[in-house]
Amino acid sequence: MKLVSWNVNGLRACLGKGFLDFCAFADADVICLQETKMRPEQASFDLPGYERYWNSADKAGYSGTAIFTRKTPLAVTYDFGIDEHRHEGRVITAEYPEFYLVCCYTPNSKDQLARLDYRMAWEDDIREYLLELDGKKPVVYCGDLNVAHREIDIKNPGPNRRNPGFTDEEREKMTKLLSSGFVDTFRYLYPDKTGAYSWWSYRFNARKNNAGWRIDYFIVSERLKDKIRNADIWSEVLGSDHCPVVLDLDV
């Protein structure tokens, strides 16, 4: 089963930058999107063979997630946990016979870490949610998780130590998640690979210089790790400040 995850940084804009051509090229069973920044009625496009599930933020033009799937899920749910987590369209869960798929756009901690306290609460709550699902069947957790976990996952770790996405607090939450029975699929296959990033600032020619961050993930339950055929980062795909990440799973 081939799964793709991509923060498109506004799907309407991405549609004008070859999104449908990308979908044809990817030939994925499931495409998970983050930061769609739209409601489904705001754009019409033809994507034959895929069912579409959307979770839009209350605030127009902000956040949002979507799952496009060739395989009909057993069930689809939106958001999780407390009311505070339910207004920004950040999570969709699709249940398949073999696993739960959780598409997530993790809240950014913002400039001056203005939202770090909320982010910490989110991380604890999403981990609890994933563990609850994992008690029923394996989990595939994907999306823009807004953290570069280790120094190898960011081009310039030193200057970014207190920047959103690379604080000790955020990185420790990822460590805690992985320690609770989950596997970072890319690092499982490529533990020492450098220069592998999924997001680049639009400033300073960051993408041209590959001054990036790996903040987009496929994370799976420990018991799925032997089913990982491949995990990849398609850094050559343009259309957003992020690139797609891909998981091939033998299920």
What do these predicted ranges mean?
Residues 37, 42-109:
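Structured beta-strand-rich core segments of catalytic domains in phosphoester-bond hydrolases
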Residues 70, 94-97, 221-222, 247-251:
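Active-site beta-strand termini and strand-to-loop segments that position acidic
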Residues 1-47, 51, 57-63, 78:
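N-terminal, active-site-proximal structural segment of metallo-dependent hydrolase catalytic domains
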Residues 1-9, 98-110, 142:
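Active-site-proximal beta-strand elements of phosphoester/diester hydrolases
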Residues 7, 23-41, 101, 130-151, ...:
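Active-site beta-strand/loop signature of hydrolases that rely on acidic residues for catalysis
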Residues 30, 51, 122-211, 215:
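Metal-dependent phosphoesterases centered on the DNase I-like endonuclease/exonuclease/phosphatase
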Residues 60-75, 204-226:
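Conserved beta strand-loop-helix elements of the APE1-like EEP
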Residues 81-82, 107-123, 158-162:
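Surface-exposed cleft-lining segments at the edges of enzyme active sites
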